[in-house]
């Protein structure tokens, strides 16, 4: 299992939202590149980036920061937020060279487009972000709740050929109250998808719980920024246990 640190980008800054609310924002740094470099020094392998402006508006607004992080670190980058057409996917994967892109809204609204990307780029480079609010999938930066029950949607993704999903319980995100492990356990039981846990991580016990359940990965954001988790210690422990993320 891989521990994946997160940087959420808005207006060129590193921020965190509370339960996906754009009006409840905390700014942690005006220099996201410095944070990424610090993660690299801690021996992180992957970095989870979210373009919050992109997620809300459907346009890439933090492109140059993503490019700088890719050029000035050796971190393997996954990026999500506003990736809704082939040009944007191509920009990230082919021009900037990130390792994988995360589709959310596009995956829910355009399954044929998702299939096209899986064929063109392969299963390892296309990840689907499944954001859940009150049992249903949410889109457009968590602002729109669909009528798609999350488990049905996940099973549809599996049929299409998706391999990896990042699942977020929006009610947990940014709360430091612990992930909704019942949700993740259910998904693992009902599908064969590789599940990355996202939202609500509060301390190292959550990382251990995810590892014990053999989840594919866990994303850590606010718990690090608020000093609740010593990521350097966690990376060292994970590297010794040899949890690879292919």
Swiss-Prot record:
What broad class of enzyme is this? isomerase
One GO MF term:
1-(5-phosphoribosyl)-5-[(5-phosphoribosylamino)methylideneamino]imidazole-4-carboxamide isomerase activity
* Record has Metal-binding as a keyword: no
The EC number of this protein is 5.3.1.16
- Tell me yes or no: is Ribonucleoprotein among this UniProt entry's keywords: no
**Which stretches are transmembrane?**
none
The pathway this protein participates in, as annotated, is:
Amino-acid biosynthesis; L-histidine biosynthesis; L-histidine from 5-phospho-alpha-D-ribose 1-diphosphate: step 4/9
Keywords of this protein's UniProt record, alphabetized? Answer: Amino-acid biosynthesis, Cytoplasm, Histidine biosynthesis, Isomerase
The record ties this protein, via Gene3D superfamilies, to: Aldolase class I
Q: Name one GO cellular component term.
A: cytoplasm
Q: What is its main location?
A: cytoplasm
Q: Which reaction does it catalyse?
A: 1-(5-phospho-beta-D-ribosyl)-5-[(5-phospho-beta-D-ribosylamino)methylideneamino]imidazole-4-carboxamide = 5-[(5-phospho-1-deoxy-D-ribulos-1-ylimino)methylamino]-1-(5-phospho-beta-D-ribosyl)imidazole-4-carboxamide
Q: Which SUPFAM superfamilies match?
A: Ribulose-phoshate binding barrel
Q: Which GO terms describe its biological process?
A: L-histidine biosynthetic process; L-tryptophan biosynthetic process
Which InterPro entries does the entry link to? Aldolase_TIM, His_biosynth, HisA_bact_arch, Isoase_HisA-like, Isoase_HisA-like_bact, RibuloseP-bd_barrel
Catalytic residues identified in the record:
8 (proton acceptor), 131 (proton donor)
Query: Which compartment or compartments is the protein found in?
Result: Cytoplasm
The Swiss-Prot or TrEMBL record describes its family as follows: Belongs to the HisA/HisF family.
- HAMAP family linked to this entry: HisA
Q: What is this protein called?
A: 1-(5-phosphoribosyl)-5-[(5-phosphoribosylamino)methylideneamino] imidazole-4-carboxamide isomerase
Instruction: Tell me what organism the protein belongs to.
Output: Lactococcus lactis subsp. cremoris (strain MG1363)
Gene field: hisA
């Amino acid at each position: 299992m891989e521990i994946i640190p997160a940087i959420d980008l808005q207006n060129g800054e590193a921020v965190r939202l509370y339960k996906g609310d754009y009006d409840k924002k905390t700014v942690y740094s005006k220099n996201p590149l410095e944070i990424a470099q610090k993660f690299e020094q801690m021996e992180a392998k992957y970095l989870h980036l979210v373009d919050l402006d992109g997620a809300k508006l459907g346009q890439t607004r933090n492109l140059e920061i993503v490019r700088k992080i890719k050029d000035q670190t050796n971190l393997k980058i996954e990026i999500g937020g506003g990736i809704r057409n082939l040009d944007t996917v191509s920009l990230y994967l082919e021009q900037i060279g990130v390792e994988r892109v995360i589709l959310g809204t596009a995956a829910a609204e355009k399954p044929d487009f998702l299939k096209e990307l899986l064929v063109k780029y392969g299963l390892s480079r296309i990840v689907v972000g499944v954001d859940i609010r009150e049992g249903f999938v949410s889109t457009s930066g968590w602002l729109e709740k669909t009528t798609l029950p999350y488990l049905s949607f996940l099973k549809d993704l599996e049929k299409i050929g998706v391999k990896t999903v990042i699942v977020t319980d929006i009610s947990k995100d940014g709360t430091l109250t612990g992930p909704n492990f019942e949700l993740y356990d259910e998904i693992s039981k009902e599908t064969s998808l590789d599940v990355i846990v996202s939202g609500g991580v509060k301390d190292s016990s959550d990382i251990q719980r995810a590892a014990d359940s053999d989840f594919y990965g866990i994303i850590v954001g606010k718990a690090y920024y608020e000093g609740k988790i010593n990521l350097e210690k966690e990376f060292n422990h994970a590297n010794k246990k040899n949890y690879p993320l292919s």
